[in-house]
Each structure stands twice: as structure tokens, then as C-alpha cells.
Design a protein with these regions (language model features):
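Flexible, polar/low-complexity N-terminal or interdomain linker segments that lie immediately upstream
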Residues: 1-64, 144
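Long, low-complexity, proline- and polar/charged-enriched segments
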Residues: 30-32, 84, 91
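Mid-length scaffold segments of soluble, non-membrane domains
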Residues: 48, 52, 56-80, 88-90, ...
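Residue-level detector of anion-binding/catalytic polar loops
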Residues: 52, 120, 137
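Solvent-exposed coil/turn segments that connect beta secondary-structure elements
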Residues: 59, 76, 100-102, 127, ...
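Catalytic cysteine-centered active loop of the rhodanese-like fold, especially the PTP/DSP P-loop
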Residues: 86-132
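Active-site neighborhoods of enzymes that stabilize oxyanions during catalysis
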Residues: 135-144
Length: 144
């Protein structure tokens, strides 16, 4: 009986991991008190109302595809990118940061760095994969 339970559990976990649409088996350890986490539907509504989107992924990923209007603000080159975009960042009332998904801490780090500079920013839960999965618009290339 134990062998059947073990085999069934193993098969279920393997399917969950391989399906690409599996359930998260742990809480996102990157989320901290004070983080403003939003879902893809709310993010899209905010984009339509003029929110500034910030892509925390490495710039090469941004160039492949990003949310329309998003600025590249990669966590691994934050200071340089922040300096380049500071006037726009300081003028926004609504910023949303995203990165590569569940296992990506970059959006959380960028949002906290912005908050330290007096710029509140929400974090798109599940990031870029959630946006793509919802079939929301994307843009290719280096232009926002």
C-alpha cells in the first residue's frame, strides 16, 4: 500500500512540475511585508489607465519582448538604468514592476529600491509568464 501511495505521489509531483501549468507547492519566499502584489488582470487594467511598467529582467530579455510601454529597469544594472529613467520614474503616480515569474526575485528587489527612493511600485505576481499566459499584448525590440 505504501508503495502505491509513494508511486502516485511521485507521479503527481512529476506531472505538476512538467505540465507548465502546475500548482505552486510553496509560498513565494521573496514576498515581504509591505510588498504590493497584484495579479495580471489588475496589472492590465492599470496599464490601460497609464501606469508605468518596469521590466526588472536583464535587458536582453526586455529586447526579446516586454509589456508595451515598459521601461527596462534591470535589477542587475539598477543604478545605471535608474539614472537614465529617473525623471520619468519620479513623475509617475503608478508603477508596476515585473520579472521572470515565480522564482524571480528581481521585481521585488527593484520595487523595494524604488520605495527607498520614494517611488511606490506594485509587483506583478508571477511576472512575465502570467502576462503572456493571459494573452495580453507584448512588444518586441528595444523600444518601450
Amino acid at each position: 500500500m505504501a508503495a502505491i501511495i509513494l508511486a502516485g505521489s511521485s507521479l503527481g509531483l512529476a506531472w505538476n512540475a512538467a505540465s507548465g501549468r502546475g500548482l505552486g507547492l510553496s509560498r513565494n519566499v521573496f514576498i515581504k511585508d509591505g510588498d504590493d502584489i497584484i495579479q495580471a488582470g489588475e496589472a492590465k487594467a492599470r496599464l490601460e489607465k497609464g501606469a508605468l511598467f518596469l521590466d526588472a529582467r536583464p535587458e536582453a530579455f526586455y529586447r526579446m519582448a516586454h509589456i508595451p510601454g515598459a521601461l527596462s529597469l534591470p535589477e542587475d544594472d539598477f543604478d545605471r538604468a535608474y539614472e537614465r529613467h529617473e525623471p520619468r520614474l519620479r513623475s509617475t503616480l503608478d508603477a508596476v514592476v515585473y520579472c521572470s515569474g515565480f522564482g524571480c526575485e528581481a521585481s521585488h528587489i527593484v520595487a523595494r529600491k524604488l520605495k527607498e527612493r520614494g517611488i511606490p511600485a506594485s509587483i506583478l505576481h508571477e511576472g512575465w509568464p502570467a502576462w503572456e499566459e493571459a494573452h495580453y499584448p507584448i512588444r518586441e525590440g528595444a523600444e518601450p
